[in-house]
Amino acid sequence: MYSNELVVKMLNYIDDNLYKRITMDEISSIFYFNKDYLMRIFKKELDITIMDYINKRRIFNSLELLKNTDDLVIKIALNSGYSSLEYYSETFTKILGVSPLTYRKFTKVNSQISDKELEIIRTRLPDISSLLKRIDIYKNNIKRSEVKKISLFK
């Protein structure tokens, strides 16, 4: 199996299980490769670690829940695959530069949010969006190359 095919399979597994607890030991046992090898090829192919990818996907997915529901932040955290509110809030703040509650305020009409917080949100959100677009392009390119390989052997 080529490393890029393996990375696509890992991406698909992660995306399908994003709301569950995912560990490197689990990924390693599913794909029958050493976890260090899997982490290395993932980073080499995508220029992001597996755990960073998982956290950014989870946080990005939680943005819609914060924006469009009145659910408690702990409920959103648990529904996004985090085991605790503290870890979710810490990860959210690390990635976006503001807390989940500050982001929620930002999305509400007539919100009271400082210019500094607003600027932080505006500069960091495109980074996550571009990462996810880059991952989709990567997956599509691998799929296209697989189709070409198959047609060459017909």
Question: Model segments located where?
Answer:
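Well-ordered, non-transmembrane segments within structured domains
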Residues: 1-2, 17, 23, 154
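Short coil turns linking two alpha-helices in DNA-binding domains
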Residues: 30, 34-35, 83-84
